Structure formats: structure tokens, C-alpha cells
From Swiss-Prot:
Gene expressing this chain: ssr1
Pfam families registered for this protein in UniProt: TRAP_alpha
Transmembrane segments: 164-184
Residue ranges, Lumenal side: 21-163
Location(s), subcellular: Endoplasmic reticulum membrane
Membrane topology designation: Single-pass type I membrane protein
InterPro entries attached to this UniProt entry: TRAP_alpha (IPR005595)
Signal peptide: 1-20
Protein name, per record: Translocon-associated protein subunit alpha
Family, per entry: Belongs to the TRAP-alpha family.
Domain text: Shows a remarkable charge distribution with the N-terminus being highly negatively charged, and the cytoplasmic C-terminus positively charged.
Keywords: Calcium, Endoplasmic reticulum, Glycoprotein, Membrane, Phosphoprotein, Signal, Transmembrane, Transmembrane helix
Amino acid sequence: MNKLITLLLAVLMIISCVYSDDVEITDDEVVQATPTSDVSFSYIFPDNQDKNFAAGSVVEVLVGFTNNADKALNITHIFASLNHPQDFSVFIQNYTRGDFGIAVEKGHHATLAYRFVPSEYLEPREFGLLISLEYQDGAQNFTQTFFNSTINITEKETSFDMDSFFLILLGLGFVGGIGYIVYGKMPKQKKVRTVSKVNKNAVRVETEDETAEWLSGTSAASSKVKSVQKVVKKNK
């Protein structure tokens, strides 16, 4: 009889231990639970709606958070990671966690902006992207992954292209035209001319050769004129 009682006690102890373990596991699951019925999410990549992200460039995602619960919820963090496209458990890059601390009352909506930068050294190819949001209801913390999909990393666009070149040329031409118009309308300075005074006494000297040339073909040409000097003085 004693053996039977001892056996029953042992069975009860084993059952009690198993039940206790089940309760602990359930509690852990509740802490990590994500009650999707209490919240709803929306998102958009305003500059990358085709989900093509340039390596080394800022990527912005706008997250819509609607509180469907019967009490206020506090948004604490948003974080993201780049993963292997075939195995999302393989992390390639973890991005900076964004701190928010925004309280959303029941029945209200909030929009948050989260930004991250894929490394400029990433090869242009397909990657997996996870973006998650953490929030709390005052007693428990919850995590919701609202984006879980593949994206494409592309080469970073050059900062200078032909469109930029023509825009620069157009701008320079416009500035040059404005400058030319302004310069043409500016008053020009008058040039000051220096007028030299003419001496009232004019002196003309004629040599023998000049006189001979002037008298060539006349009767006076035969006369030998050694030198003629005429001084003409104008009356004052």
C-alpha cells in the first residue's frame, strides 16, 4: 500500500513539473507576441517605389501606424537589416535603430520616417530587407516586422550627367546675357581729347630741290636757285 502511495506521489510530481514548464514557455511567447489585431501598418518608399536602392544613398521609408487597441500605445524603435535573399536569417548589414518614443492614442494614426544607407561597397544584386517596429502598451513590449521582402541594390548614380551639364551651360548663358544687357545700359565715360595749340607763327622752309621741282618746265627753271627760304608770318 505504501509503495502504491509513493508511486502516485511521484507521478503527481512529474505532472506538476511538466505543467510548470508549459506555463513558463507560454509566458515567454506572450512577451514576444505581436497582436496584429491591435495595430495595422502601411509603408511607402517615396523615392524608391520600384524597390531599387542605390548603394551609398539614403533610403527613406514612411511607416503608417494605426492604433486599433483600447488604450494608448507607445512607438519606441524602428530598425532594419539587409539579409541574404534566399535565407533571411543570414544578416549582411544591420542598420541604426531609430528612437522615437511617440505615444499613439487609441483610434489614432501616426506616420513615421525611417532612413538607412546601404553600404556603397555592396554589389549590385538582389538582397532581402527586413524592417521592424517596436512598441509597448505600458506593460509589454511588442515587435512587428511590417516589411519582409527582396529589394535590388543598384550602382550609385553619378552626381554629374549630361542633363546637369546642359543645365549648367544654360545657366551660364543666362547669366552672361543678363550681364551683357546690364553692361550695355551703363553710362559710358566721355573721352577727353587733348587739343594742341597751333603756333600763330608758321614757318615754311623750302630747299633748292623743292623750288627746282616746282619751277620745272618754266622759264625760271634755268635760273640757279641755291636756296630759298621763306618765312611767312601771320599778322596777329
